[in-house]
């Protein structure tokens, strides 16, 4: 499962995020990966943003790996609407990751069934935002709509479920190996 979210804008300050499950080749333990890239350009005629020009600039993109416990924390933060922070250090990079809830006001157009007139109604919906800050000055951020955050939550649940399956299978195989080994000692 892979989730791609692109949010370019005309001020050329948008970002694209990718969320996906990867696994360790040796033991098949799954992890959540988040890749983020800064918007490179904006085509005002076509009203579309491009990210590909930032691909080769290491300061314009980032990749982060999360374990199953961090996936559990993400799910808990989403379900209980609290801010979740974590810190990763790799080589010379120090990275702060923050998932924050916020209330987004949207406007819906509705039709009055009696008068057949349209009217607008404001509604507050639960949204989230992710901000990733590397080395204090490289910032990657994206707002997340309710549907997007639900998909991320399902991806995190899938990773935890697969982790449980893999480790349970490994434990069963280990037990079978112990049964096949004869020993003069009992433990």
Predicted regions and their residues:
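N-terminal intrinsically disordered, cationic/polar leader segments
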Residues: 3-6, 12-14, 23-27
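Short, hydrophobic/proline-enriched secondary-structure or compact coil segments at domain edges
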Residues: 19, 30-39, 126-132
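Short, low-complexity cationic-aromatic patches
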Residues: 21-28, 64-68, 120-124, 137-150
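A short, structured beta-strand/loop element
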Residues: 27-53
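A cross-kingdom feature marking solvent-exposed beta-strand/loop segments within repeated
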Residues: 43-64, 134-142
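Compact, well-ordered interaction domains used in eukaryotic information-processing assemblies
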Residues: 50-55, 62-88
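Intrinsic, low-complexity N-terminal interaction/targeting segments
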Residues: 85-130
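Mixed-charge, glycine-accented linear interaction segment located at domain edges/termini
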Residues: 131-187
